[in-house]
């Protein structure tokens, strides 16, 4: 960007990508145990990013992710964005399990809850 570092919007993309990969990996591992007729997915309700240091381009970015709380229909996910040996940002997100037909939150199936905690 004009300031000479990775724009703050890119941090959100790094975080979203890590969260999406986690959710896909977990659901793929237990796919055979899930109701195949279910039309549910995850939506982001809230994302709070604390920008700690700049990220310069080009470079590599790693995102660490940890589920810190699972509720009935949502979970809290903590993230750390790392580059060049330091933490550039931390973030806390709330993801909601969302019924694509009713367009509303729905309870997270127990199988998914258990798999997310492993």
Spans of model-derived segments:
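Terminal targeting signals and extreme-terminal segments of soluble enzymes
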Residues: 1-62, 68-118
